[in-house]
Structures are given as C-alpha cells and as structure tokens.
Amino acid sequence: MKAGIPLSRCTQRIPLLVARQVSRNITTTTTKFSLAPEYNHIRKVFDSQKYFNHFTKQGSHATLFSSPQTGLFHNEYLTTPQGLVDFSQQSLSQAKQLVSEMLSQVNTVDGKLKFIKKLDQLSDILCRVIDVAEFIRVVHPSVKWINAAQQTHEMMFEFMNQLNTNVELYSSLRDILNNPLITEQLTPEEIKVGEYLRQDFERSGIHMDPQTRENFVTITQEISLLGSQFGNQINGLKSYWCPVTVAEWESIEDPQLKKEIKNYQSKYDGIRQSETIQIPLVANIPYTILTNCSSDTLRKKVWVALHNSPDEQIETLNRFISYRALLSKMLNYKSFADYQLEHKMAKTPENVITFLFNLQKSLIKKGVVEELSQLSEIKHNGSGSASVNDIVNDIKPWDRDYLLARLQQRMQSEVSAGNVKEYFSVGTVIAGLNELFTRLYDISFVPMAALKGETWDSHQVRKIKVVDNAANKTLGFLYLDFWSTKVLPSHFTIVCSRRLNTSIGSETIEGMEKLVQLDEDYQLPVVSLVCNFASSGNFSFGRFAGVENEKPTLLTLDQVDTIFHEMGHAMHSMIGRTELHNLSGTRCSTDFVELPSVLMESFSKDPRVICQIGRHFDTDEKLPESLLGQAHEHRIMLDACETFMQSKMAMLDQKLHNEEMVNLLAKGLYEVDSTKVYHSVEKELKVFADEWSTWHGKFPHLFSYGAVYYSYLLDRAIADKIWQGLFAKDPWNGEAGKKYKESVLKWGGTRDPWECLADALGNDELKQGDSRAMEIIGQNSNL
C-alpha cells in the first residue's frame, strides 16, 4: 500500500523473492499420480500454439468475419486507451457520489450501519482503476495504453489524497466503531475492515491539527519523491571505470578478455595515468573477472567498484531514512520500525531482531561454516583454515563467484541443465499444478477462450477459470502470460473478491457486470501472472509451440519454482473469498502474505511432486529421480550462505529504521550516515563481510519494504513449520491440503495470522503472537 492512502491497498503487485530451500529428509515413496482427462487439454493449450488458436476460435464463437468483443479483463470500458481514461473518470464520479451519499446519511442509524460496507465499496471502486492502470503501465506493450495508464494513475491518486484529508469521513468511521449500539449489529468482518481503515487514517495523520497534518503530508510526499529517485538510480555506479595496475591487468589469464579491456582504453575520457589500466564496468567484463581471474587484488578492486553506488544515491537514501525517522516522531512512535510493525505479525522491532539473531545462529551451525569450509579448501588448495572464525574471515565477498565456479567445476556431472528442462514445458507444469490443486484443495483449472480485446496479447495470454469442484462454483480467473519481454515474474491483483452491495442499494448487478466478472452478486477475483521466460538466456526453442517446429517453451528448475511461487499467491487470491474487498485474498499482513507462495516452493523442490509432474516434452517419460537429484546438487551450493546474506539485509533494514535514527534528529535532520551503519552490520555479522563498498544504495527494498524486509525470511520459517506439520509425509495428501485451506488460505486478511497458524499446526501457544510465538517459529528451522 502506498504511504498516505488509507482507503486502499491498491497496486497489489507482489514481486518474486526466490528462495533456495530444498526439501530435506524426504522418503522416496510417492503417491500414485493419476492423470485426469483434462490433463492433455491443459498441456496443449499452453504448449501448442496451433491447438491454442483452434481452441480460442471455437470457444469464442468467432466466425470468418466477426467475433464477440469486450475490453481488457472483461471490462467493457477498456477497449482503447481513451476507454481507460473514461473508466477512471466514470469511477471518480461514482466515488464522489458515494462519499456524498455516505456523509449525508451518516447521522441516521441506517446510514451508520451501511457506512463501512460503503467505505469498502469506495475503496474497491478506486482500486479497480488504480490496479488495472498499474498493470497496464508495467506490462502493456502499447505506448498509448501506457500513457493513458499514467494519466489515470495521477488522476486517481490526486483524489485519494483528497480522501486522506477528509476529516468528516474519518470522524464518522471513528464514532461508528466507538458506538456499541451500532457495532453489535455489524459482522466481525465489517468491524475488522473498519478498524483497519481507521488505523490507516490515523497512521496517515488525519487526527492531527491542520498545521501538523500539512507538515505530515509534505513529509510523506517528500519521502515518496525520494523513493522514486532512489528506485530510478538503483543500478547506477559511482564510476563505470575501475583503475588497476598494469601488473594486475597482466594477471588476467584470458587473452581475449585482456584484449577487450585494452580496446576500451581509447574510450576512457578521464585523466590518464602511467602504469594504470581502466577496466570498464560494462557488459560481462567485470563478471568474467570475478568468476575467472585468480588475482585476489584484481577481483577486490573490481568487486568494490561494481558495488559502489553514486554519492547522490547514498545521500538520497540518507534523506528518506531521516524523513521516516521524523515522520515516526510526529506520530509518537519510538522509531519508523515501531510504526511499521505495530500491526504486523512480528509486532515489535525487538521480536524481529531476536528472530534474525536466532536464525543466523542456526544457519552458522547448520550450513554456513560447512559451505565456507569447502570454499576455503579450494582457496588454499586443500588446506583450509582451521577455526570457525578463521574460515568465516578468510572468505571475502570478491572470492565468492571465483571459488564457487571452481567448486562447480569440481562437482561437474554429466547431466546438463538442458536435460532437466526437457521434462518441464510450460503446459506440463500448469497441468501438473492442476493435478496438485485438485488433490489438495479440490480446485481445478479450466482453460477459457478469451474474447477479442480481453487480453493485452491474444497470441500469448491464456485465460484460466478456477473452479471449486465440490461446490461447482467459479472462484475466479487467471490471465497467464509466460512470454512477456517487459516484466520480471510478478503476481498482479486486478480485481478483488467481495460481495456486491446490492442488498443496501448502492450498486446493481446490471451495472457491475459490465466492469467485472460475477457469480450472481459476488465479484470474482482476477489475477494476472506475468513472467519473462521468452527472454531466458538458455532458451533454444521457438517462443510458442506451433512456431516452426511445434516444440514448447521449456523451463529451468528455477523457472518451475517461479511458477509454483506465483501460483501460491494466485490460490490465496482465489480461495481467500471475503464479503468485503479490503481483506480479501493476499490483502493480509505484509509479513504473512508470502507464506502461500513460499510454501509452494517446498512442493516444487520435493521429488515426490516434481518427478510426478515432470514429463518429457517428446516421449512423455517421467522425470527420473536420479536426474533431478544431480540437478539439485548444483542448486543448493551456498544455500545457507545465501539465506544468511538475506538475514544481513533484513538486519540492515532494521538498523536503518530503529530508534537511534530518531535520536539523531536532535543533532539535525541530515545526520544519518547509512554507509557507517551498513559497514557496522557487515563487520558484526562477518559472512562475506563488505566493509569497503556502498552496495546498500543498490538495495531497493530499503525503500519499498522499509523495516519489513524480514518478512520473507519469517514466512520461509513459517512455511517450513507448515510443511513439516502437514505435508512432509505426503505432499499429495488431500486431508492436509484441506486443513491448510480451511485454517490459512480461506481467511484472506480477516483473521489474525497467528490464529491461522495455531489452527494449522495445532499449537495454541502461537495464538498469542508474542516473542514466544516468534521463538517457536524460529526453532529447528530447515531454512
């Protein structure tokens, strides 16, 4: 959610954070994988362009001269870029009318009883515009659509900011929630949504006096501006040239690389120095040096230069950290971390620090030292350092890629990644997931023929109806594009599930069915998963089946993980059906939202699942477990170290948003020195310690996840507990799937996450959500 926008959790785009966890201690017994009749149909819809084209033509009732039409995502307005602008203007008009109606009726009992439902409807009106505009801005191939989306975004956020300062809306909501005669007639979900919206109003400064509120708004706008600047410069370098001595350049073993660097010297426009060679930090040159060059001093210089941010970037970071500290002080919080965590699962910064500390201690014991020992042996030709301290201090960040490459050469097997890919076409994975979800949740995927205009690319995008088999009801729709050239893997919520307000007369089915897809009076969720598998470096086949040779898109194991991860989010959106939109599906606590997606990665790494799903694109042979095992061996190198590095980033995130930053305000607004904090954290935590560069200026989550970057690690720990408690014995077990669905997925954000976990794991101690609960989650984790 954007800062200062209480009425909505819009732009529900969830970026992928890839875990490297591999299921351990797995028994080799498997559940029989019986293919449903729909299996081949789903597989062909994704793998054969010819089959897909025929299916689409038949299903949409198209003729030679005409075919039924609609707009993007079945919204009748969204047929042209101007239609998007018209949709936003119509929605604005509807929103303003609804606000006027709410405030004119709030003094009546009936008006009070309907107020929260209408406030939720108002949020939904705005979200449906903002979310689709954000999607178009990021994904759509047309510049005209993108420009219209930008115009729409600005228009809607301007109105959002007006609502933020609407004291009458806030005071009416506050009075309703404080009136027991009214609240006793409201549902628990209405009260929870009302409390959530009140909290967001108050956390946005609505209850302040006018002057203080004006200052607050100015600060939040400044933070937003600085965040945009920070994001725009995230890939910048302090210098794109790294000076090294001629002797260091001579130490490069690859003559072709030396020649390439030499040829770049004429392009250097700085002051030339004798006995100095300028290494350009462009293309693959620095990465080749870090991977292949044996000189420690050369690798160190290149590594530091490659990780140094521009001075202006570090200054931008220091400033938004300072402003966040000031904002939290204005709101009477000890720190920005306290402000951020108040309504999260972790609750306090102290709980987060304890969780991270325990996790790091566990990682050191369970894998970090062992992994670093392997690197140390290679570095010292078989005679590595003796003590744990020596081993940890011995391996520098610029050693990592070089020594890892040597380790991989030593462990090189005859199995190539290409061999494994042949068992995982896109269609095979989606059809396999359909089998898994049918077994676990009694939910099925039904391919649908999209109408003309319903998708942003009629050749690429597949539409899937998600069906609850037991109830014979449609749960929602997925729009899947695995061949985008624009977007890193992402899950976009386009429309949230909710019950229409037909019973209170503020909207009609006839009016809404032009904008959304319905099941009677229920608004069905729409989710889009977008991936960029077409641009994969190892891609050797046509982008689509039916292009030239009918060979499908084949996926690496990492890409299979990606689909499983994103489908975890999608199923949360489909199953988390609520009456009100604000807490549906993935609209739950930030440090709980990754649980369903991370848990799915445990399925994608379990041989009992992946060997059943994987089938050779040509022979239909199942994936041999021995082949998978060899491929996994390469994937888990430095697994514990990678997780430890994530924990260091989470610790840095906490340190930069803690009480000390607020205390520095006494000395002046710009006293924050993020580089000093970064180097201090690195020195303290040691593993691949960086005390030289300003890499923290390249860490985008310091802005986007401010004080909650720990969330992903916490959700991995929770997912491990869920996996061990429910699925480790049999990942295809329907009873376990039902338990997880009923205790976690179906609630969206309407239930305390700790209660969900206590129910799923049968442990009442977790209900308190206190430091003890955090300790239980962190114990004996297999991260």
UniProtKB/Swiss-Prot annotation:
InterPro entries: M3A_MIP (IPR033851), MetalloPept_cat_dom_sf (IPR024079), Neurolysin/TOP_dom2 (IPR024077), Pept_M3A_M3B (IPR045090), Pept_M3A_M3B_dom (IPR001567)
One annotated Gene Ontology cellular component of this protein: mitochondrial matrix
Chemical reaction(s) catalysed: Release of an N-terminal octapeptide as second stage of processing of some proteins imported into the mitochondrion
Range of the transit peptide: 1-33
Binding site for Zn(2+): 565, 569, 572
Gene: OCT1
Protein known as: Mitochondrial intermediate peptidase
Uppermost EC category: hydrolase
Gene3D superfamilies: Collagenase (Catalytic Domain) (3.40.390.10), Neurolysin, domain 3 (1.10.1370.10)
Keyword annotations from UniProtKB, A to Z: Hydrolase, Metal-binding, Metalloprotease, Mitochondrion, Protease, Transit peptide, Zinc
Organism: Candida albicans (strain SC5314 / ATCC MYA-2876) (Yeast)
Compartments, record wording: Mitochondrion matrix
Named cofactor requirement(s): Zn(2+)
GO molecular function: metal ion binding; metalloendopeptidase activity; peptidase activity
Function: Cleaves proteins, imported into the mitochondrion, to their mature size. While most mitochondrial precursor proteins are processed to the mature form in one step by mitochondrial processing peptidase (MPP), the sequential cleavage by MIP of an octapeptide after initial processing by MPP is a required step for a subgroup of nuclear-encoded precursor proteins destined for the matrix or the inner membrane.
Coarse class of the protein's main subcellular location: mitochondrion
Cofactor details (free text): Binds 1 zinc ion.
GO BP annotations, alphabetical order: filamentous growth of a unicellular organism; intracellular iron ion homeostasis; mitochondrial ATP synthesis coupled electron transport; peptide metabolic process; protein processing involved in protein targeting to mitochondrion; protein stabilization; single-species biofilm formation
Enzyme nomenclature, EC number: 3.4.24.59
The family this protein is said to belong to: Belongs to the peptidase M3 family.
